[in-house]
Amino acid sequence: MREIEFTFKGLLIRLSLALSDLIFFNIALALAIVLINGFPGEILTGIPQHELDLKIATHILLSVICVGWFWVRLRHYTYRKPFWFELKEVFRTILIFSIVDLSVSALSKWELSRWIWILTWLLSMAMVPFGRACVKRLLNRKKLWKKQSIIIGSGKNAQEAWQALQSEEMMGFDVIAFYDVDGSQTALELFGVPVLKEEQQLWSLVDSDTQFIVAVEYEQSQSRDRWLKNLATHNCRSVSVIPSLRGVPLYGTDMAYIFSHEVMILRVSNNLAKHSSRFLKRTFDLVGALSIITLLLPALVILIFMVSRDGGAPIYGHERVGRDGRKFKCLKFRSMVVNSKEVLEEVLRTDPVARAEWDEDFKLKNDPRITRIGHFIRKTSLDELPQLWNVVRGEMSLVGPRPVIEAELERYAGDVDYYFMAKPGMTGLWQVSGRNDVSYETRVYFDSWYVKNWSLWNDIAILFKTIGVVLKRDGAY
């Protein structure tokens, strides 16, 4: 009976997601026609009825094929993928189908406005992911989306796997237990999740829908093999393996295996070493920076006036280390008093707590040097807007590692070479992952991860995340 129940649950989830995509694909067309040609009563003006009928029929057919592609080829309705990874696949697929639609329209010589085509597919890119997110939240409220999960392992790799899954809430993995494969874990709980010691305890929690995540340590390969066989003999259908690959570039990595051998070959991709990738990133930076400067020019003029009211220069440049170790002046709106250097020296000399905080992070949470307007522009990250000029000059990028002073390079230790491979960014993985609330070691890890796994899509994802972080003012001081 439970097998039937969970089979029905899985089918309901897949059909709900597929139906949502299909509906929003076609709502996008209807909305595009309304926006371009007016409201009902005016829609058919100047458009032959048979062409409109053919356009609608073609779009419905393409939407059905696209949903089939999502289901069968990309497995969006059967596999749970990270949000930004799935979104990239959705955008890429919709772009391909939009080109097919344009080709059909051109060959058919329809009189429909090309703006209908543009708006239809732009709306599809926005509405299909939005619809999916709504359906997943609705399923979650009905307790259908969450998938009971057990992590096989309790060491560092298993704990990092748990943290990664928690950061992707929309994947819906509800970890109910860790399983200690070799008895080495002394804690009874990790992150509030129980650590199981006995197999009997584990199997008592399992049903046919349970997701198993094998995340043992590198040196526990025998335990991994034993558990994969154990899960196979128990007919467990949902099994994932998270190998210990810390330090290995993951984005763009291809996997292959040698026939009849248990050997997996990972072909890693050093994207930032490619001239084409650097040209693409530079073009993206220039277009983005110049567009933002044009858009925010009135606000920049107002900020210059407000910051300079105390008699000091509104913009200052602080020396930072850039790509290949080249030094440059990193521009910012001045957020501190004019005699900030003397104030800092006095604070560090008289306050041992502040001295320790400065030595640890090169920052002070309650910095006495910051002015009233300085607090505001720091909280909102407006103090960093002059760095757009650094981007235009090619010294910085819109997205990249956090720009550091020379003294901080010692903290990067063996990862400093990764830092030198990329231009520092106005924003980056560190800024959207806690900013000042994370340890310096974690900052270094984020910078290294970004460089090893660079892609233009990751830059776009970080920029969108930055908007949310700035609005919520997370970790800013």
Curated annotation (Swiss-Prot):
UniProt-recorded Gene Ontology molecular function terms: phosphotransferase activity, for other substituted phosphate groups
Main location: membrane
InterPro entries assigned to the protein according to its UniProt record, in alphabetical order: Bact_transf, EPS_sugar_tfrase, Undecaprenyl-P_galact_Ptfrase
Keywords from the named record: Cell membrane, Exopolysaccharide synthesis, Membrane, Transferase, Transmembrane, Transmembrane helix, Virulence
Protein's cellular compartments: Cell membrane
Membrane topology of the entry: Multi-pass membrane protein
Enzyme Commission (EC) number: 2.-.-.-
Cellular component GO terms, alphabetical: plasma membrane
Transmembrane residue ranges: 16-36, 52-72, 93-113, 115-135, 175-195, 284-304
A family per Pfam: Bac_transf
Stretches of the chain found on the membrane's Cytoplasmic side: 305-477
Coiled coil: none
Functional pathway: Glycan metabolism; exopolysaccharide biosynthesis
The keyword 4Fe-4S appears for this protein: no
One BP annotation, GO: polysaccharide biosynthetic process
Family: Belongs to the bacterial sugar transferase family.
Function field: Involved in the biosynthesis of amylovoran which functions as a virulence factor. May act as a sugar transferase and may be involved in the export of the repeating unit by flipping the lipid carrier to the periplasmic face of the inner membrane.
Protein's UniProt name: UDP-galactose-lipid carrier transferase
Native organism: Erwinia amylovora (Fire blight bacteria)
Originating gene: amsG
